A protein has these predicted regions:
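Mid-chain, well-packed structural core segment of small domains
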Residues: 77-103, 107
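Sec-dependent N-terminal signal peptides
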Residues: 3-13
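N-terminal small/polar-rich segments of proteins
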Residues: 18-73, 96-136
Length: 136
């Protein structure tokens, strides 16, 4: 009976010790750079592998709406952009979405400059920050 008890204790401890994991890899580029003309585009992609279900949230520092309307800014000046998502996500920005376990689920993030930068906007460096938050 003592041996059986030790075996059960060891078995239950091994289940506790199994860690869940998620990893991100395969970034095509860490930075999205738009050219200085209307409708210019940039994109990146990456893969997520999780051995358990996870939730994912795509966000932008300057996000205006969940359909991806955002802007780049140099402080006082703004240029409107459109952010797009493809992958297992619903395509919504600023909305946490639950996903099932997967191996190498590919996500693509793209941005398009919606406004003409030559229409009265001063030259400068215009920025936005995109973040991806994963909970598992």
């Amino acid at each position: 009976m003592k041996k059986l008890f030790l075996f059960i204790a060891a078995l239950s401890m091994s289940e506790i010790a199994m860690a869940q994991y998620c990893s991100i890899d395969g970034f095509t580029t860490p930075e999205l750079r738009l050219a200085s003309y209307q409708r210019s585009q940039a994109a990146t992609s990456f893969n997520i592998s999780c051995d358990t279900g996870y939730s994912i949230l795509f966000n932008s520092q300057n996000l205006v709406s969940s359909n991806g309307i955002s802007y780049v800014s140099n402080g006082p000046n703004k240029l409107r952009t459109k952010l797009n998502l493809s992958g297992a996500n619903s395509g919504l920005w600023g909305v946490r979405v639950n996903q099932g376990a997967s191996q190498r689920q590919k996500y693509i993030v793209s941005v398009q400059l919606e406004e003409n930068p030559f229409n009265g906007v001063p030259a400068g460096t215009y920025r936005d920050r995109i973040s991806v938050d994963i909970n598992f």
